[in-house]
Amino acid sequence: MKKTIALLTAACLLLSGCQLNSQKSEPGAATDSVISSMDSLDDGANAAAPDQGATLGYDWTQNDDKSAGSDASQVPVPEMDAADDQTLFTFSQMSLINNELAETAPDDNYRTTYEVFVYSFADSDGDGIGDLNGLYDNLGYINDGQPSSGMDLSAGEIWLMPIFPSPTYHKYDTTNYMDVDPAYGTLEDFDKLLKECHARGINVILDLALNHTSTEHPWFLAAKDYLEKLPAGKDPVKDECPYVWYYTFSREQYPGFVPMDDTWYYEARFWEGMPDLNLSTPEVRNELSTIMKFWLDRGVDGFRLDAVTSYYTDNPDGNMEFMRWVADTVHGINPKAYLVAEAWTDQSSYASYYSTGVNSFFDFAYSGADGIIAQTARGNMSAKSFAESLANEENLYSSVNEHFINAPFYTNHDMPRSAGYYADDDGPRTKLAGALNLLMTGNAFVYYGEELGMMGSGKDPNYRAPMYWISEDECDAAGAGDEAGTGAKIEADTKAAEAKAEADSKAAETKTEADTKTTEAKVEADSKAAGSETRAEVKMVEQEMSDMMCDGPAEMDNFAMKFGSAYSQISDEYSIFNYYRNAIRIRNSFPVIARGRTVVDYDRTNDSVAAFTRKDSDGKYEPVEIFINSTSEPASVDITGSDLRELKAVLTVSSDKVMLDGTTLTLPAFGICVMGEAK
């Protein structure tokens, strides 16, 4: 389904009866007029079109030209007939301003990473289980390889949750660290995916659970078989079966140990199907070194280290020593490899782990329903406190390692989905929270479906629901097999097209009867041709998106989603998806956002508005000042005296606009803007 997303957006445009001129406007030509006269745009469906030369925020056409200098997103607004008072487009301020941005993120480890649970992402073979080819077919949704195309999320890295063979759906208990689970595909499928990711500038990191294996791993099976055959009272001999020392066995049941048989117990802190590895055994470390080299030599860009506080039970020093060993091993193979670790503990503890050489640690203080991000979005934490927290944590981490790369995230596979955090929210707080994450320094992480506002709470399988490509109603429409399958969408747009045809006919009454008949005949022919083509394309999109939907974990509950599917959100200018897309575009366009340091602007910060600058120490990147209104009411600040007074980018949760009137900056409810140096 390589072209489904492109077809979807193209089809949506066709349904509106619109066609775009293929000419390019001069980049930046309309920016000044757009910013200065934004208040003149009508927010309604019949808004007046911007001046010729302003640009759309989407590439509505399939553009396979990837040659240097190609920029499919710079599509001018079609010229409108002066007599035609019906405008075909509604423009958001985000599209009009952010479309001018050039995504210039450097090739380093400060990225935006998209977490993918392959099992639930996209199915390519119809078995209901996501697979690597399903991900390959849908890379264009994550990153289409065309900067500023305006159709993809533009994520620069993918974190693959475990892909190794495993008896469980989540695959954190592997039976072979150097292969791909057959349900997901083959090593060749992985190589194909990795090659395409790299061609698009996407890094790929693998989830690596070094703490434990499956009880079905050959190492454990060999140890189990040996111990079960060992005569009563005899101690195991390492030369006879070294795999016994790969784990921790005992004839006594200590805390955290589970029975293997009537005589032996083994350590399994997570659950009985995950026996803990003895990471102090040199042979185990040799095995793990071989595993990491296998994947790094294959081209993998790094690893996500699972549960690093559990390497050694109640032994923080042992955990840190092992993290140092992993970092030294990985960076000895590839100095540019990226490591991010899960240390689900308090902030001061995981801050201290930056001394180990691991590049990043997930910033749990900001995540989840009770984290700083959600508390700020709810209004339980002031904007000022949020800004101060950013500066304070950066100072904390840099005091341990000045080269730290923070790993902020809002949600992940072990947490309830974020759309359920705000019971009365119809989108604004969900959007704001996403931006708070994506405007933090470091390598920001987004969990698949978060950009759609997916739901899922109660138990782990619910957090890992199928990617919401298309709703059940849309699936049913795809399976209907007739014209009604396109539903009200086509019906409504057909009526609109007929109404416009009638209006065009009346406008032509002053012409000769022959001309009128010719015009009517052409309108009718064009309408029928466009309608047939549109129906075919929309039905193909619906069917393909329906086919790639996954079943999800068997233990998952049935529950409804709160917001629209990818199918509906991609073409919705004000959707959560397009808000995230704009936030990532801003992050990519101003490298200092991820790589700079936060300094609170106390002259302009208050409980409603967070104002802080981002600058890097060596002045390599253009500095910016970020303003965030965390409240549900408009808020104004005076930027008199600021060197960063040019409006560069905006994030708005609705059609309300960021306004700059002289030195007064007004942010709408939950509005955000980026200010920079005047050119």
Please tell me what each predicted stretch does:
Residues 1-8:
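Positively charged n-region of N-terminal signal peptides that target proteins for export
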Residues 19-45:
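Short, low-complexity, disordered segments immediately C-terminal to signal peptides
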Residues 91, 391, 403, 409-412, ...:
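Loop/helix patches that line or flank the sugar-binding groove of alpha-linked glycan CAZymes
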Residues 215-216, 221-222, 226-250, 327-328, ...:
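Conserved alpha/beta catalytic core and glycan-binding cleft of carbohydrate-active enzymes
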